[in-house]
Amino acid sequence: MNTKGLVNWAIWISVISGIYCLVYLFTVGQFTSDNVLPGWQIVYATFTALPIYFTAGAKREDFIKYICSYLLGVCWGMLYLWIMDRLAGMGIITNPWVNIAVVVAVVCTVECALHFTVLSKLPFSVVPAQFGAISNTFWCSNMSIAILGPGASAIGGFYNFQAIPILMITLCGGTLLGLLCNEGLNFIDAETGNWKWPGK
C-alpha cells in the first residue's frame, strides 16, 4: 500500500478509535465511575487488547479465539492473585516481592505448559493475549484496592475483584476495536490508496 493509503488507514483507525472511546465513556465508563470504582473508569484496558490482536493481523477468523483468550487470561490473573493472597494471609511467604516472584514463576510454568501442549488447539490458547489480560488483571485489582480497599474475601490484602467484569467487557471491546481498525483496509484501494466501497 502506498503512502496515501497508509494515511487514509491512519485516519480510519483514529476516527474509529475516537468513536469507540466516546461510546465507551458514555456507557461502560459512566457506569463504572458511578457504580464500581467511584470517580474512575478503565477504558485504557482497551489499548492492551487492541494492539495484541491488531499486530497479529486482526483476522476475522481469529476474533473469537482472542476474545476467549483474553477472558481466560483474566481468570488466570485472578488465580495468580488468589494464590499470592493465600500465601501472604497464611504467613507462608510474607515478603510481597518474593511472593509475587514465586507465584508468577510457578503458575506461569503451568499456564504456558498447558496452553503450549494439551490445550493448544482449543479456542482460548493465544498465550500473548492471556498475558495481556493477566497484566490488566493485576493493575485493575491494585487500582481497586487503592480506591476501595482489599476485597472482602482477601485474607492477605492482595486483591479486589470488584472491577473484573468491567475489565472483561473492556478487553472484549478492545478486540472488537482491533477488528474494526483492520476492516478499514476494505475501504481503501491497495494500489491507489483512494477510498473505495468494499467489493469494488
Where are these regions (language model features)?
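Membrane-helix interfacial "entry" motifs
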Residues: 1-6, 54, 58-66, 92, ...
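Helix-coil boundary and interhelical linker segments in multi-pass alpha-helical membrane proteins
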Residues: 27-34, 82-94, 156-163
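N-terminal topogenic module of multi-pass integral membrane proteins
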Residues: 1-47, 51
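Hydrophobic, lipid-facing residues on alpha-helical transmembrane segments of integral membrane proteins
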Residues: 7, 11-23, 27, 63-83, ...
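Short, highly charged, low-complexity non-transmembrane loops/tails of multi-pass membrane proteins
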Residues: 188-200
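Pore- and pathway-forming membrane helices of multi-pass small-molecule/ion transporters and channels
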Residues: 31-57, 105-153
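Membrane-interface starts of transmembrane alpha-helices
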Residues: 35-42, 91-103, 162-166
